Amino acid sequence: MRRLTTLAAALLCLSAAAQQQQNSNRNMLLNAASASQPRQISLGLPIAGNAYIFEDGLPVSYYNYQLYPYKSWHSGVSHESTQTMSPQDMVLKYGIISYSVDSRSRLAGDRFEGRINYSFNMYGKQSVDANISTPLGSGWGVSLGSYQNFDPGSNHLDMSYLQERVQFYKGSISKVFAEGRGKAGLIYQYSNYLNHIENFGPFVFVGDGSVRELDGFRLGHDSYRPADRYVDYLDVATGKMARMQIDDANTDKIHNVNFVLDYDLPGGTHLAVHSKYKTGHSFRNNPTISGITQAGPESGFSYADGTVYTGRVQNRRYLHFNAFEESWMSNAALTGQSGDGRHRWRAEADWWRNHAGTETSMWLIAHEVAADPKLLYLNGKPGFSYNSYAEFYNGREDKVFAFASDEWNVSDRLWLYGGARVEYLNVRGKAANDTNPGNARHAGFSLVDPSVQLNDFNDSHFNYSYIGSVRLTLFSGFGLQAEYSSATIHSQLFHYGVYPYPSQKPITANYFRGGIYWRNRWIDMTSQITYIEQKNAQERPSFSHVLTRDAGGMKAGQEENLTMPTYYDLGTLGWLTDAVLTPAEGLSIHVMFTVRNPQYRNFKLTPTFSDGVTEEHDFSGKTITALSKTELEVEPSYSTGPWRFWLSARYFSRQYINKTNSLYFNGRWETFGGIDYKLNDHVSFSANVVNILNQKGASGSITSADLITDPTPYKNYIMAGTFIRPFTVELTTRISF
C-alpha cells in the first residue's frame, strides 16, 4: 500500500526562530521497525512509504519512492549535523505537511580531523563509519568518508548471507572564504545498498487484541521465507520469464553530486545555493504477506519433487521493481532581517527536474506455514497470477517553485509568522494507463501483448501551500499560540505506472493547532488542540478474496489478491501536550501525550474479483488502520561527569487491523535505552538496548483481513503480519582525533 503523500507528524512547540523549529526532541532516528531508516511521526493521518530526508538543502531522493532516501543516506560521522525539520518548514520547502530529517555534510575545517565509529550487536551485525578531513591551504580542504554495514538480521535468512549490506563512499572538496564570509563545497557519494525486506511471521490472533506464538515460531528470530536464491518472474517489458539472483534483485546503486554555497552578503543578507545531480538504479524484490489458507489433496499444491502437499498455505505477493532515477535539483535562498531586528525574512526559488521510470512485475507464491518454510508449487509451477498487477512508466517531471516567509516580532508580547509557496508542476512521458481495455492488468499481462497500447501523457498543474502562526504572551513565560497551514498537490510521475489513468484532482491537506505554552527554567510545555484533514487521498490497497470458483488460473478455495486505486478523505481531531522538564542539573525529561480520533471519510469501494464476485464496502467513519487514538512518549536523560543514561519509551494504544475495524491489536510499548561513557576527549563508548520489554509488536494492518466484518470466526485465528525488532543489545566505540 502506497499513499500519494505522507502527510505525517505530531506537533512541535512553536518557535520564534527558524532554527528552533528543527526540534531535537523528536528522535526520528530511534526506529523500532528498522535499524537503518528514520522513523515516521504521525500527525493523525496514515503513514506509508518512508521518512523524508533532506541533505545539504535538498531531498536525498526526488521521490519518496523507488530509490528510497535511506538507500543513499546514513546518519553518521560524515554529517556535521542531523536534526528534525518541522512541518512549519516542510510546508514551504516541500509543499507537504510532514516532518523530515535534515542533515548537513561534514566539510573540511581549519585543522585535520578524523572520526571512526565501530558498532556490533548480539545478532552479528557489524558496522564501521569513518571520516577524515584536512585543510590544504588558502581556505581549501578535502574530506573523505565511508560507511560499511554487515547485517545478517535477527531472523537469519537461508536465501542470503546478509539481510543488509551497505557500502557508502563519500568525498568532498571545499573552500572557506576569507574573513569568515562563507563556505562552498562539492560533494560526491556512491552508494551500493543490498536490502532484503523480511520482517514477517505467523502468529495466532486470539480474538481479544492479543497474539500468541504459533507452534513455537519465534517472531523476530525464525526465518519465514523459502531458501530459494533466485527470483523467477514474468518480465512485464518482454513478456518472457526471467531469472535474477536474489541479492542482485535487491540492490540499489546510486551516484550523488552535491554543490553547496553559503555566503554572507553586505547588509546582513545571507545567500545559500544548493544544487544536486543524482543518477541511480534500483532492483527491489518486495514481498508482502497475504492470507493463510488450508490446502486439501485436490488444491493443486505440491513440493518441488511433486509430492502432494496438504496443510496450511502462506500466500505472498511479490513485486519486482526495475527502476531508475536521474534528477537535478537546485535552489537559491536569501535570508535577512530588518534594521530594527523585528522582521526575519526568507525567499527561495527552486527548479527540480527528474527523468525516471520503472518496470514492475508481480506474481504470487505459496509456502509452508513454518520456520524455514519450503516453497510450494501450484499445479506444478512455483508462481502464479503473474502481472495481474504491474507498473510501467518512463517520463520526466519538472517542478519550478518559489516561497517567501517572514517572522515579525510586533512587540514584546505579539509574534507573527507567515509564508506562502507556489509551484508549477509538469509531468510527461509514456505509460500503459489510458482507456484502452487492453491496458487493464490481468494474469499474464505484459507490454508486448497485442492489445496493449502505450500512451503518451502530459499534465500540468499549479500547487499551492501556505502557513500562518501567531503567539501572544499573556505574562512572562505563558501565553497563547495558534497555527494554520494548507498544502495542495497533484499526481506525480510515479502515479502513472498503473492502470487506470491517475486522478487529476487536487489533494489538499489542512492543519490547525492552537493552545497554550508555558516556559520557565524547569519546564518548556505546549498544550494544544489539533485538527488535520486530507481531501482526495489516493491509495492502491490490496484486498484478499477466497475464490468461489476456478478463475484467473486459480482454483476455487484459493485466495486471490486484488489491487485497485481508491480515493477518499480523512480527518483527525486531537489534543496534544508536549513538555521538556529539567527539574535538576543534568536531568532532562521529555513527555508527549496525544489523544485523537483519526477517521476515514467518503470512503466507498466496490471490488470485483476474478470469479465475478462484487463486494460493496463503506469505511466512512471508521478509525484509520494502524493509527492509535492515544500515544505517550517518555524520554528521560541524565548526565553526570563522563556518564549519560537515557531511556525512550513510547506507548501506542489499540490499532485496528482492517478498515472495517472488526479486528484490532492491543496497545504496545516501543522501548529503547542506553549508557554512554566518555573516556576522554578522543574515545567514548555506548551500550544501547532496543525493545527492552521484548515485545513481539505484531502490528500494522493485515491485507487478508481488510474486508472482514464478522470477527467471530477469527478467534484463535492463524494469520501472518509484521513484527518490530526483537530485544537487541548493541555496543559502539567512537574515536576522534
Predicted segments with their positions:
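Short acidic/polar hinge/loop motifs at secondary-structure boundaries
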Residues: 58-85
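Transmembrane beta-barrel wall of Gram-negative outer-membrane proteins
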Residues: 113, 120-151, 157-226, 249, ...
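Surface-exposed extracellular loop regions of Gram-negative outer-membrane beta-barrel proteins
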Residues: 389, 426, 439-447, 458-464, ...
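C-terminal beta-signal and adjacent terminal beta-strands/loops
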Residues: 19, 586, 653-656, 677-737
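Gram-negative outer-membrane beta-barrel transporters
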Residues: 522-524, 528-542, 550-659, 681-682, ...
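N-terminal periplasmic accessory domains that precede
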Residues: 39-41, 53, 70-72, 82-83, ...
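Face-selective signature of the C-terminal outer-membrane beta-barrel domain
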Residues: 252-281, 308-442, 465-483, 518-528, ...
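Acidic/polar loop-and-plug regions of large Gram-negative outer-membrane beta-barrel proteins
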Residues: 174, 183-258, 283-319, 373-387, ...
